[in-house]
Amino acid sequence: MKKIIMTGGGTAGHVTPNLALVPELKKSGYEIKYIGSIEGIERKIIEKEGIEYFPISSGKLRRYFDLKNFSDPFKVLKGVFQAKKIIKREKPDIVFSKGGFVTVPVVIAAHLNKIPVIAHESDITPGLANKLATPYCTRVCVTFPESVKHIKGDKAVLTGTPIRRELLEGNKLEGIKLCGFKDNKPILLIIGGSLGSKIINEIVRKNLDNILSKFNIIHICGKSNLDENLENRKGYAQFEYVNEELPDLMKASDLVISRAGANVIYELLALKKPNLLIPLSKKSSRGDQILNAASFEKSGYSLVLKEEELEDKTLMKKLNYLYENRNVYINNMSKSKMDNGVKNITELIKKYTK
């Protein structure tokens, strides 16, 4: 049996695409193992899937000054030695890396063990982890056509992003039942990313009466961001984080407010959900979500509201516009030729398996 080691972590966006590949890889005869960080979100997600998980030391890669920048390189170095030992013992035929800071030591370790590495970059421009890892990769899968020019060494392959099959098979009635909605108002799903979004949470709750006058709300607010004062609010269902329930909640929703991470916007495209994107500002990111959102807005798939312009009036104005023109966005998304990347990436993995 062929063996693959997968890696990726830090946020759910670096983990769920790996899960999307798992059924197809198993069908193709691969035994799957996973290397991730000790305390990252990926550990709980992967172990729940019954995949053997190997934790290693990892340091966060920052673009700003922090005292931890002096100690974290030593954590990365420790992670390289740990990953090298795991890879030498497990003898995988190939490594697949989805990005996030934990992947850098794994990719370097695979290279030192002469194991081919396929990486995947979701955003238009590569993140710092993938930039550091690219020299050690055999090929780098990209999601956007615009991304090809940003990958050095002629390694880029346009594959699209992998989307979990079960996400496309949600049950609308189950989603409504889970939320306890009793009327026929349109449903607004709000996603702030796997770690939540303070600014989106705050403005939604500030305008709750106004929004609830038109919509029922499913609010995925992130860990430790539940508001106990709103637990029994009619028409408002809040969740810290969802996994198995997400397909049903997505299916039940009529509109979506979301950050603009590449994975989630491609999921919205696949599901043809009219969406309002609020990308992370450059104050708190490298600007990748701004580029992702601009690409989808240009294609007519999304309406965009800059974080700097996020106010009570602008939020309600954009929401109302999106709902009134929802069929235009659905029609535009229906014409998209973007592929689910599962098949393309699996074929590439098979091609470069030792």
From Swiss-Prot:
Transmembrane segments: none annotated. Pathway: Cell wall biogenesis; peptidoglycan biosynthesis. GO terms for molecular function: UDP-N-acetyl-D-glucosamine:N-acetylmuramoyl-L-alanyl-D-glutamyl-meso-2,6-diaminopimelyl-D-alanyl-D-alanine-diphosphoundecaprenol 4-beta-N-acetylglucosaminlytransferase activity; undecaprenyldiphospho-muramoylpentapeptide beta-N-acetylglucosaminyltransferase activity. The keyword Cell inner membrane does not apply. Its EC number is 2.4.1.227. The keyword Cell division applies. It is an enzyme of class 2 (transferase). One of its GO terms (biological process) is peptidoglycan biosynthetic process. It is a peripheral membrane protein. It catalyses: di-trans,octa-cis-undecaprenyl diphospho-N-acetyl-alpha-D-muramoyl-L-alanyl-D-glutamyl-meso-2,6-diaminopimeloyl-D-alanyl-D-alanine + UDP-N-acetyl-alpha-D-glucosamine = di-trans,octa-cis-undecaprenyl diphospho-[N-acetyl-alpha-D-glucosaminyl-(1->4)]-N-acetyl-alpha-D-muramoyl-L-alanyl-D-glutamyl-meso-2,6-diaminopimeloyl-D-alanyl-D-alanine + UDP + H(+). CDD domains: GT28_MurG. It comes from the Bacteria. Pfam families: Glyco_tran_28_C, Glyco_transf_28. GO terms for cellular component: plasma membrane. Cell wall formation. Catalyzes the transfer of a GlcNAc subunit on undecaprenyl-pyrophosphoryl-MurNAc-pentapeptide (lipid intermediate I) to form undecaprenyl-pyrophosphoryl-MurNAc-(pentapeptide)GlcNAc (lipid intermediate II). This is UDP-N-acetylglucosamine--N-acetylmuramyl-(pentapeptide) pyrophosphoryl-undecaprenol N-acetylglucosamine transferase. It comes from Clostridium botulinum (strain Langeland / NCTC 10281 / Type F).
